[in-house]
């Protein structure tokens, strides 16, 4: 079981990096700060769908329903974490030139990583 847990955590990290830093469009970035914006939600939906994919890859199709549950949790949490970060930066006018922008980006990424630790924890309880 520990190999599966480790594999899931690694794949969630790779999935997160790819969707957040390689695949994300400018429209998705702009939409994340507007609550329930379809394009901003699409970004988080891709994260949730990616979680379903990697969980199914690790645990197999017999656990498809569990994969859907943790994918949905990831979608909801990812959306709200991103929305909060975008609105904090917007409210205070933080841009990439401001160290507080980077502090909030770091907090955003930490929250996503804690989400993945929580999702992995759900696989072992």
Regions found by a protein language model. Give the residues of each.
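Hydrophobic alpha-helical transmembrane segments
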Residues: 1-125
């Amino acid at each position: 079981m520990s190999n599966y847990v480790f594999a899931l955590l690694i794949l969630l990290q790779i999935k997160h990096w790819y969707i957040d830093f390689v695949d994300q469009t400018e429209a998705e970035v702009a939409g994340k700060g507007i609550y329930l914006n379809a394009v901003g939600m699409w970004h988080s939906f891709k994260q949730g769908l990616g979680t379903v994919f990697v969980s199914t890859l690790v645990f197999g199709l017999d656990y498809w329903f569990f994969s859907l549950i943790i994918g949905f949790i990831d979608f909801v949490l990812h959306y709200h974490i991103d929305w909060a970060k975008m609105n904090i930066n917007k409210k205070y006018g933080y841009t990439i030139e401001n160290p507080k922008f980077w502090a909030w980006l770091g907090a955003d990424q930490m929250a996503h990583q804690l989400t993945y630790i929580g999702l992995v924890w759900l696989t072992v309880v």
